[in-house]
């Protein structure tokens, strides 16, 4: 009986949290896109049934292709994303989830002319590939933030969506990432760092190297996060970025969460920070863990020090 009551309380808490997050997004029209991995019918149905959400989810965009880890074929995923980005409505274009597949449709995106109207585009993880394309090729200010399916994850802080809603509704003039911890001496002595933001998922940033959509880091504040990365692999990926010249003329680096941030992971990050002559910071405020605060590509930003270091993004 006790276990049953606990289970009921957990379900009730999750339902209340999901309702609260959904309510914060009330009256915001959202077109859901799946440029990477898809979801089963139950997940899509559960999203549609969240009270207060105005989601447009086209069933044609979830017709399974030959590869089971993709939402649909490359052609279908591209067409659905293109239609959402070029739609003349003021709908927010919000990625369903990450997984894998976004990079596969970039060659087709490169053939398109920039739309007349800039859309608000949200997502993270594998969606980093699209952020790099949209921010670099079209000059858009896209938002690195929770995918819409994260509304259904009880382990996610639903405040992630409250903060996104405040941005979408124009309730805030700036966005902040708090609790930046300096990892090297040059970061500790920094008072002000200015620059526009780029970055995202480390695996996808590494994947971009040598492609037509390779990340452009010069003069930027670079933010990076990842999940399920063994410490030796993390060191290898960061070394690849360094040897590829991606840290040259970077204003600063901000590391988000890397899984549970084990002692070995932090050792890798601190050791790597010490090898660079640019400020390097660490925070747990964005990434694949519970908290995933929004970060805006291409916006004028600054790292400032008051009582602590924080990132401030203008809107």
Q: What residue ranges belong to the model's regions?
A:
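Sec-dependent signal peptide recognition
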Residues: 2-9
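N-terminal signal peptide c-region/cleavage motif recognized by signal peptidases
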Residues: 15-17
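ATP/NTP phosphate-donor binding region
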Residues: 20-89
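Short Gly/Thr/Asp-enriched flexible loops that form oxyanion-binding sites at enzyme active sites
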Residues: 98-116, 132-134, 267
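Short, acidic/small-residue loops that bind anionic groups at enzyme active sites
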Residues: 111-133, 141-147, 277-280
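Conserved anion/nucleotide-ligand pocket segment
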Residues: 141-204
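Internal helical hairpin/lid segments
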Residues: 213-265
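ATP/nucleoside-binding phosphotransfer catalytic cores, i.e., glycine-rich phosphate-binding loops
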Residues: 257-315
């Amino acid at each position: 009986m006790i276990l049953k009551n606990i289970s009921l309380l957990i379900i009730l808490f999750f339902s209340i949290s999901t309702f609260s997050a959904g309510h914060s997004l009330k009256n915001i029209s959202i077109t859901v896109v799946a440029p990477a991995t898809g979801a089963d019918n139950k997940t899509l149905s559960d999203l549609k049934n969240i009270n207060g959400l105005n989601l447009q989810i086209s069933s044609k965009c979830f017709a399974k292709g030959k590869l089971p880890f993709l939402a649909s074929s490359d052609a279908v995923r591209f067409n659905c994303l293109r239609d959402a980005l070029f739609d003349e409505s003021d709908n927010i274009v919000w990625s369903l989830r990450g997984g894998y597949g976004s990079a596969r449709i970039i060659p087709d995106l490169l053939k398109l002319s920039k739309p007349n109207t800039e859309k608000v585009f949200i997502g993270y993880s594998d969606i980093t590939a699209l952020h790099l394309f949209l921010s670099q090729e079209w000059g858009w200010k896209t938002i690195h933030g929770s995918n819409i399916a994260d509304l259904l994850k009880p382990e996610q802080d639903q405040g992630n969506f409250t903060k996104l809603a405040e941005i979408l509704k124009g309730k805030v003039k700036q966005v902040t990432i708090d609790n930046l911890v300096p990892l090297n001496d040059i970061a500790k002595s920094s008072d002000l760092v200015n620059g526009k933001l780029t970055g995202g998922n480390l695996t996808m940033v590494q994947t971009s190297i040598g492609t037509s959509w390779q990340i452009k880091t010069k003069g930027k504040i670079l933010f990076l996060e990842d999940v399920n990365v063994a410490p030796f692999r993390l060191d290898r990926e960061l070394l690849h970025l360094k040897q590829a010249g991606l840290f040259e003329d970077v204003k600063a680096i901000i590391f988000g969460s890397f899984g549970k941030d084990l002692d070995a992971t932090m050792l890798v990050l601190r050791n790597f920070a010490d090898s660079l002559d640019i400020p390097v910071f660490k925070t747990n405020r964005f990434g694949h863990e519970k908290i995933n605060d929004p970060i805006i590509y291409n916006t004028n930003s600054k790292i400032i020090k008051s009582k602590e270091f924080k990132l401030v993004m203008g809107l």
